[in-house]
């Protein structure tokens, strides 16, 4: 297994594991945050280089879906990681919607987007 990836014995969904391994291969240190046992309490997904990040892996290329990713992530972390590799037809328009939403967000301070196996970072 990759030395940059610590799973803490947490069973990840395939998309989550794929994202973690992708980032680890890019040199990021990824640690899975152990989920809370408290009902209705959501934890962020990862520590990435020591910072808390929430991962969203949308599967639909719709503005509403992308908006929901921001709203849900903001409740868990100020850092959002969006992996678009599972969206069929993700294109420049998809990225434009995401970047525009990020620019107007008061709660999300950092954004990383994985699209076409490229990592894009915004602050």
Which residues does each PLM region occupy?
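Conserved catalytic cores of phosphodiester-cleaving nucleases, focusing on short active-site segments
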Residues: 46-59
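Metal-dependent nuclease catalytic core centered on acidic motifs
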Residues: 1-29, 58-123
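A short acidic/basic microdomain associated with nuclease active sites
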Residues: 26-39, 44-45
């Amino acid at each position: 297994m990759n030395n940059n990836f610590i799973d803490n014995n947490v069973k990840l969904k395939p998309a989550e594991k794929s994202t973690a391994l992708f980032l680890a291969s890019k040199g990021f240190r990824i640690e899975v945050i152990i989920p809370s046992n408290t009902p209705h309490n959501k934890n962020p997904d990862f520590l990435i280089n020591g910072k808390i990040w929430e991962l969203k892996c949308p599967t639909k290329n719709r503005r509403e879906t992308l908006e929901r990713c921001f709203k849900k992530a903001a409740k868990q972390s100020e850092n959002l990681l969006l992996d678009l590799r599972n969206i069929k037809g993700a294109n420049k328009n998809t990225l434009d919607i995401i970047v525009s939403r990020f620019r107007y967000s008061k709660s999300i301070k950092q954004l990383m987007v994985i699209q076409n196996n490229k990592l894009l970072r915004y602050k």
